[in-house]
Amino acid sequence: MIVCRSHAEIEKLRRVNQLVAQVLAELRQMAAPGVTTAEIDHVAEERVRTAGAEPAFKGYHGYPATVCVSANEQVVHGIPSNRQLV
């Protein structure tokens, strides 16, 4: 099924995608040895909420965080923690 979007809906999608790109660029810069995935998550949530948006993952089926962070041996959907990146 193809969903047709209005111009207003497309504009909202464009704006939120720009926000996501900006946040991901900032998080990419943060990802360095010694930084915890919880710190990355905190910054992501702060940036999203400051922009007037809501984190999509947080609370979805009980997911406790804003981002999914997988590092090293983790495969996917890692829950942010106080574990430092190495």
What are these regions (language model features)?
Residues 1-86:
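Active-site neighborhoods and metal-handling regions in enzymes and metal-associated proteins
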